[in-house]
From Swiss-Prot:
Main subcellular location of this protein, as a coarse class: cytoplasm
Function: Component of the large ribosomal subunit. The ribosome is a large ribonucleoprotein complex responsible for the synthesis of proteins in the cell.
Keyword Magnesium annotated: no
Example GO biological process: translation
Family annotation (InterPro entries): Ribosomal_eL28, Ribosomal_eL28/Mak16
Identification of the protein by name: Large ribosomal subunit protein eL28
N-acetylserine modifications at: S2
Gene: RPL28
Modified residues (Phosphoserine): S115
Source species of the chain: Bos taurus (Bovine)
Keywords: Acetylation, Cytoplasm, Isopeptide bond, Phosphoprotein, Ribonucleoprotein, Ribosomal protein, Ubl conjugation
Organism ancestry: Eukaryota, Metazoa, Chordata, Craniata, Vertebrata
Length: 137
């Protein structure tokens, strides 16, 4: 079934849809912007890209759909864990999408999602206020 036909079926009735604030969002896997649109839908396309946080809380997992084996959903996804510093991680994602000519329209969205995940994994430094001297009278 073509992606356009699947989109016509799925766009208004899906278990992943969330409608609030006069907008429609989607919680499906591999939807980089969580938007209910044809481009970012993670279910209907033959090639999809997803970025998730790694299980151990350090790094990201890039999920890509294989071109071959579309009829076998259990083996149709390739998961690559990237556990480097932020610049190298974003560069790796950029190269995975650009060098393989794999959905270049999703490159910037994947980089932004990975950047947000990496930023959330950074430890928060607590700023201590300098203690005020006590008044001596």
């Amino acid at each position: 079934m073509s992606a356009h036909l699947q989109w016509m079926v799925v766009r208004n009735c899906s278990s992943f849809l969330i409608k609030r604030n006069k907008q429609t969002y989607s919680t499906e896997p591999n939807n980089l912007k969580a938007r209910n649109s044809f481009r970012y839908n993670g279910l209907i396309h033959r090639k999809t890209v997803g970025v998730e946080p790694a299980a151990d809380g350090k790094g990201v997992v890039v999920v890509m759909k294989r071109r071959s084996g579309q009829r076998k959903p259990a083996t149709s996804y390739v998961r690559t864990t990237i556990n480097k510093n932020a610049r190298a991680t974003l560069s790796s994602i950029r190269h995975m999408i650009r060098k393989n000519k794999y959905r270049p329209d999703l490159r910037m969205a994947a980089i932004r999602r990975a950047s947000a995940i990496l930023r959330s994994q950074k430890p928060v430094m607590v700023k201590r206020k300098p203690s005020r001297p006590t008044k001596s009278s």
